[in-house]
């Protein structure tokens, strides 16, 4: 099992960051890899069990399902249902924690998954860098932060 953990501190208050990240169907508004997003069957994006279909900039598609959501703890989990890349049993967790020194936000994004033998490092790099770190940089731009 591969485990990827990335985190960052954003120069924005937690309420503002949560407003953006909480929208399970809104990644296309800020993540550079996502061209379009829609929930299947018109399900609300904050309904546990809803499935989002993401079309990537390269034209490929994937499906993810929201499995937990907590406004109280400002976190959620989701799993990957269909993907063109070899990620199996993928479950990810996003959690925000207030940083009271300066009204900032700590963001943890982590996942566990399996992949084909010999591809563990490549898939960990893809998830950690091309998805998570790229997402951190993109959310900063979206929130108007200076990098």
Regions picked out by a protein language model, each given a short descriptive name:
Residues 81-134:
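Beta-strand/loop substructures that line and gate deep hydrophobic ligand-binding cavities in soluble
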Residues 14-15, 68-73, 96-106:
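A short, structured loop/turn motif at beta-sheet edges
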Residues 28-29, 38-85, 134, 138-147:
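Glycine-rich portal/gate segments that line the openings of hydrophobic small-molecule binding cavities
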Residues 14, 59, 129-132:
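A structural signal for well-ordered alpha-helical scaffolds and beta->alpha junctions
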Residues 6-8, 62-68, 91-98, 111:
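Hydrophobic/aromatic beta-strand elements that line small-molecule binding cavities or substrate pockets
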Residues 10, 57, 100-102:
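A generic beta-sheet turn/junction motif
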Residues 1-41:
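Hydrophobic ligand-binding cavity/cleft-lining segments
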């Amino acid at each position: 099992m591969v485990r990827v953990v990335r985190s960052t501190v954003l120069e924005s208050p937690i309420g503002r960051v949560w407003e953006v990240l909480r929208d399970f169907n809104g990644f296309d508004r800020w993540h550079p890899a996502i061209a379009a997003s829609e929930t299947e069957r018109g399900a609300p994006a904050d309904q546990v069990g809803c499935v989002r279909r993401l079309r990537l900039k390269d034209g490929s598609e994937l499906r993810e399902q929201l499995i937990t959501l907590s406004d109280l703890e400002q976190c959620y989990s989701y799993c990957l249902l269909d993907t063109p890349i070899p990620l199996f049993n993928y479950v990810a967790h996003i959690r925000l924690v207030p940083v009271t020194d300066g009204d900032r936000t700590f963001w943890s994004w982590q996942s566990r998954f399996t992949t084909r033998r010999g591809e563990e490092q490549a898939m960990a790099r893809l998830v950690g860098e091309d998805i998570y770190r790229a997402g951190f940089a993109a959310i900063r731009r979206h929130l108007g932060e200076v990098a």
